[in-house]
């Protein structure tokens, strides 16, 4: 337990940040799952639309530091490859 005033403040800030990051992380996973669900359904139009919505969110989470920029690039690359494979 935090004893000093500054330690208590840091503990509160840390908890607030943790909850905020958990919310954003959940949102990110939700949008990625929507794209994957559309891909698994074989619906190219829906998958493309879902990917267009998810792509800036993935980029934003990388900018905010929630995920690494390479992980964001990997997400986008793999999802886009799966969408392109639907047409072929």
UniProtKB/Swiss-Prot annotation:
It comes from the Bacteria. GO terms for biological process: translation. Binds directly to 16S ribosomal RNA. Residues 1-21 have a biased composition (Basic residues). It holds the Pfam family Ribosomal_S20p. This is Small ribosomal subunit protein bS20. Belongs to the bacterial ribosomal protein bS20 family. Keywords: Ribonucleoprotein, Ribosomal protein, RNA-binding, rRNA-binding. Residues 1-26 are annotated as: Disordered.
């Amino acid at each position: 337990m935090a004893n000093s005033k500054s330690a208590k403040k840091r503990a509160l800030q840390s908890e607030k940040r943790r909850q905020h990051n958990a919310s954003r992380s959940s949102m990110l996973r939700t949008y990625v799952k929507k794209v994957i669900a559309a891909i698994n359904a074989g619906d190219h139009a829906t998958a493309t639309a879902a990917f267009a919505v998810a792509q800036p969110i993935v980029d934003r989470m990388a900018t905010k530091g929630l995920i690494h920029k390479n992980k964001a690039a990997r997400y986008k690359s793999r999802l886009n490859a799966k969408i392109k494979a639907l047409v072929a």
